[in-house]
């Protein structure tokens, strides 16, 4: 097999066959400066020695011993055991793209059910089979709006959108003839609607905002969608899918395209991926929707069946005219999210969203009583919120870690002016004792 290296006798036999003395002679036509020098690597270890080495390295990782309040798009949620049990079935784990419908009914049904679940959450008419992640979903939604409004080349982008998402969008749009205008956020972390109104015009293809946004603030979306409609622009809403269990659906808010990351449902943190992004839209935008769409049909015997539909949009049909050049199937990650959604059910998702909301706002409320720090946005937050500790965040992190807590993410990574602020995330995995301990440590800090 080609990935098993040849032993010395085999190498010597091959060199003799072609009439040369050694391997160096085989490559003598290549300048020595271009030949990669073999790295200095120790001899191999036995299996047991290798296990000992890995375990000695793993012991140095103390993070699992900390109570983590990290969030910013990748959240610690409970993952039902059923998710792993279903996703580990070989017919899902190793399945190929279901081009051949008659041989792929199981996978096609899974994707169809995922699309149905996303439509139920968002209230939208159509959803696709997922994209890479929340960032690519945002970027693809912008491309949708540019295709829909062929002559409009302006995009208004909220600065309270996840910074990683903004970077991906900028990369996507580098080759597009369009103008990207960033709409700033107010001091409490919500979108500056007056700035938005100033730049919105008949050249605007779409407004993209996030709610709950990067800072956990719940935006007043409906007035923005109405403002966009007055100029004929589309509204793209990026949202944590769990938040729909508590907040108004995208359809109720008048949104045209709903996007986000499925990570909160059934996907482990996994160092940032792989995740799956969801995309859903109104029916009139359906033919601009990228990626695969599975439809329900009847076979020649009248039995229910599933097929890839509207394939003329896809790159394996139209190449450069396709709605997207995404070619990696995120169906396994989408399956994990689907299983989690079905495990919770409609009422369970509502309860999960309410629990996340209540626990985050409990911690936020009590931290707000500490006069030496400043909690952003006195209104409601979902999952996370910003605290200004009024001292360098490195010192704050060190103190909390000494007390067994990873308190949040330093916002100076993304916003240099916010060097004393942390973004703190609270999910259903944090109990009353842990939240009270966080408050206690925070008081001791000052």
From Swiss-Prot:
It comes from the Bacteria. It holds the Pfam family GDC-P. The glycine cleavage system is composed of four proteins: P, T, L and H. In this organism, the P 'protein' is a heterodimer of two subunits. PANTHER family: GLYCINE CLEAVAGE SYSTEM P-PROTEIN, GLYCINE DEHYDROGENASE (DECARBOXYLATING). GO terms for biological process: glycine decarboxylation via glycine cleavage system; nucleoside metabolic process. This is Probable glycine dehydrogenase (decarboxylating) subunit 1. It comes from Protochlamydia amoebophila (strain UWE25). Gene3D superfamilies: Aspartate Aminotransferase, domain 1, Type I PLP-dependent aspartate aminotransferase-like (Major domain). Belongs to the GcvP family. N-terminal subunit subfamily. The keyword Protein transport does not apply. It catalyses: N(6)-[(R)-lipoyl]-L-lysyl-[glycine-cleavage complex H protein] + glycine + H(+) = N(6)-[(R)-S(8)-aminomethyldihydrolipoyl]-L-lysyl-[glycine-cleavage complex H protein] + CO2. Disulfide bonds: none annotated. Its EC number is 1.4.4.2.
């Amino acid at each position: 097999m080609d990935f098993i290296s040849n032993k010395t006798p085999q190498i010597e036999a091959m060199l003799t066959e072609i009439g040369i003395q050694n391997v160096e002679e085989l490559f003598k036509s290549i300048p020595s400066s271009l030949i990669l020098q073999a790295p200095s690597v120790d001899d191999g270890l036995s299996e047991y020695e290798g296990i000992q080495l890995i375990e000695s390295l793993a012991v140095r990782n103390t993070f699992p011993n900390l109570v983590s309040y990290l969030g910013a798009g990748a959240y610690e949620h409970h993952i039902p055991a059923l998710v792993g049990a279903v996703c580990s079935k070989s017919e899902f784990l190793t399945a190929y793209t279901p081009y051949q419908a008659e041989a792929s009914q199981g996978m096609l049904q899974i994707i169809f059910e995922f699309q149905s679940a996303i439509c139920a959450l968002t209230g939208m008419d159509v959803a696709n089979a997922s994209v890479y992640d929340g960032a690519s979903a945002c970027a693809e939604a912008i491309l949708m709006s540019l295709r829909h409004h062929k002559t409009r080349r302006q995009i208004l982008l909220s600065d309270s959108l996840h910074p990683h998402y903004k970077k991906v969008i900028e990369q996507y749009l580098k080759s597009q003839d369009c103008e990207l205008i960033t709409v700033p956020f107010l001091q409490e972390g919500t979108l500056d609607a007056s700035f938005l109104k100033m730049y919105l015009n008949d050249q605007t293809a779409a407004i993209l905002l996030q709610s709950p946004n990067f800072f956990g603030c719940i935006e007043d979306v409906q007035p923005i969608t109405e403002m966009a409609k007055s100029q004929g622009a589309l509204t793209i809403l990026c949202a944590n899918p769990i938040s729909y269990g508590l907040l108004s659906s995208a359809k109720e808010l008048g949104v045209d395209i709903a996007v986000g990351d499925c990570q909160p449902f059934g996907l482990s943190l996994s160092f940032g991926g792989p995740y799956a992004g969801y995309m859903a839209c109104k029916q009139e935008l359906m033919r601009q929707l990228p990626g695969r769409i599975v439809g329900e049909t009847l076979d020649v015997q009248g039995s229910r069946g599933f097929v890839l539909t509207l394939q003329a949009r896809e790159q394996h049909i139209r190449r450069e005219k396709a709605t997207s050049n995404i070619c990696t199937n995120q169906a396994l990650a989408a399956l994990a999210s689907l299983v989690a959604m079905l495990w919770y059910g409609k009422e369970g998702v509502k309860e999960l969203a309410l629990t996340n909301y209540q626990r985050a706002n409990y911690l936020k409320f009590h931290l707000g009583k500490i006069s030496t720090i400043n909690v952003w946005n006195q209104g409601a937050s979902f999952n996370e919120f910003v605290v200004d500790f009024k001292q360098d965040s490195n010192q704050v992190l060190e103190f909390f870690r000494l007390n067994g807590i990873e308190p949040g993410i330093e916002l100076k990574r993304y916003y240099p002016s916010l060097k004393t602020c942390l973004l703190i995330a609270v999910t259903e995995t944090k109990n009353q004792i842990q939240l009270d301990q966080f408050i206690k440590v925070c008081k001791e800090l000052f």
